[in-house]
Amino acid sequence: MSFQATPTLLHLAVRSLLRNEALAVSGLQDLPVELFPPLFKEAFTHKRFMVLKAMVQVWPFPCLPLGGLMKMKASYLETLQIILDGINILLDQKVHPRSYKLRVLDLRALHKDFWNVWAGDQAAAGSLEVKRKKKTQNRGPRIVAKQSLKVFIDMCFKPRALDACISYLLLWVEGRKGLLGCKKLKISTIALRNIVKVLEMLDLDYMEEVEVCCTWKLSTLASFAPYMGQMRSLRKFLLSHVCIPVPISLEEKGKLIDQFTSQFHNLEYLRELSLDSISFLEGQLDRLLRCLTVPLESLSITDCELSESDLKSLTQCPGIRQLKHLDLSGVVLTNINPEPLRILLETVAATLKTLDLENCRIVDSQLSVLLPALSSCSQLTTFNYLRNPISVAILERLLCHTARLSRLTLEMYSTPWEIYGAQGAFHHKRLEQLREELSRTMEPLKHTRTVWFSIIPCPPCGY
């Protein structure tokens, strides 16, 4: 036997309204504000398109968070078309009733709680999504001047064709410059031509996060750069796998790099920068760093080749002096003087919270130079030193230094190389001895801490 919850008075009222769509539409002007979210949700669920189209035109909140109800997939295409038809009617009006409040149609997968609220004050929280530079007001008693409306969406470009809903939306916004805003953009395709067409439709001022995760040539990146420079609200930029064609002159290479790096002058809100597997970075990092206009909170340079001069330029960059997160994993430092990295750690010691040096191939002699600087990072909470060859002796010294860091809660290391035999065989007895020794080292600590050891040998190092 199954039991179903008894419908509330609210749900009964909503269902009663939807039994006659024409009657429901005629009564929208007198409908209490609190009934709009549940009525819209019910009409959406049961595809009462006449009601949906009419409700869009008299929506009593600044934001209609449609993305909290639907995904931008083909199965919702008809519903999206109806909603946009209603928006069309609004856009064609020269003046609106004073009750008109809609400023944002949000198609992002957010605000799912909105549709479960009843109180008007909670529902009005959607207005936080409104980001307007200017307001036009008219104190007339019955009408207000036409104001701008924004449609927000998160974009993801993949090698396959765009989803039906996205394609329809892009057709709908053609000729309506500045109507479509995007805060998160992900690019997973090398075909820039189609991306540019969409970028030219977007109001790029609203862009906050961009992720480029495909194999672009340096020339492709340079062509994308002017659009990036228009993203003046950009806070997070992730770039991976940019390669350089073999037949390219140093002059041409420098010109393309400058086309990209010069755009950072415009990014006054940039806080997170991630560069992964960027082949042009070695010896060129200073070109980018000197274009940073604001302090970064997070810097990730991973699986890249860097020179000693690149590390020195990091220590001299004002934009990294307030770093909270530093990730250099996969940057091989074996043959590089550790002094620049030591200075870098000292520079960010007052703010650094996470440090990732996984697979940097740092050897004991280099680590010894870094220890005093590492122990001065008073805000450090996480330290990743996996896949670096380390001896028992230097590990014990390292733990003595990190023991001074009261906020450190997680440390990750590879098992010292002495634990392995000549052929890389793992010796459990040696590991148990090491555990006992390290436990004695950690006993004086006055706070909880996790020290994690990997027993997987590092193939490149042989440990």
Question: What positions do the PLM features span?
Answer:
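Helix-rich alpha-solenoid scaffolding regions
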Residues: 53-92, 228, 234-236, 244-275, ...
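Extended amphipathic alpha-helical scaffolding regions
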Residues: 153-157, 168-173, 182-187, 192-200, ...
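Cullin-RING E3 adaptor/co-adaptor recruitment helices
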Residues: 1-218, 243, 386, 417, ...
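Conserved hydrophobic beta-strand positions in leucine-rich repeat
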Residues: 64-67, 100-108, 155, 178-188, ...
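Short amphipathic alpha-helices and their capping/turn residues within compact interaction modules
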Residues: 18, 22, 36, 40, ...
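Short, solvent-exposed loop/turn at the beta-strand->alpha-helix junction
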Residues: 19-23, 33, 48, 113-115, ...
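A structural signal for leucine-rich repeat
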Residues: 197-202, 222-231, 248-267, 285-295, ...
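Charged, low-complexity intrinsically disordered regulatory segments in eukaryotic signaling
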Residues: 1-6, 333-342
